[in-house]
């Protein structure tokens, strides 16, 4: 009888582990979608939209003035590295952006180090780092 119970306990633990893997996979798929939407917002100059991916402790915090970014044109981006934490709740992503400013058409490259965290309660990813500093 003890062996019989032990088999069911092991089976239940395996099933719970598999369910956890599915949850992790689902969260990482959400991250890919979120990251791509964020990168596309930057690519098309939608800086207010990109800022909406940031976690703000207080929704009444002052939103930055994006006026200085209106002449920035991102020509391309390339994800260089993605580092996923062991618990799959934090992702560090390193992205190269090529861009220029309308007043000076010299193409520049900036490396952006992004930190993302998953909010289990809201079931979404938040950008914890700042937007790229396009000089």
Describe the residue ranges of each PLM region.
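Short solvent-exposed beta->alpha transition segments
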Residues: 32-33, 47-92
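Glycine-centered loop/turn positions within well-structured domains
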Residues: 16, 48, 123
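Sec-dependent bacterial lipoprotein signal peptides
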Residues: 1-20
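Structured segments of extracytoplasmic/periplasmic soluble domains
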Residues: 37-45, 53-57, 119
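Short, low-complexity N-terminal intrinsically disordered segments enriched in polar/charged residues
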Residues: 17-44
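Exposed beta-sheet edge and beta->alpha loop/turn motif
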Residues: 86-135
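Secondary-structure transition/hinge residues
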Residues: 1, 43-46, 101
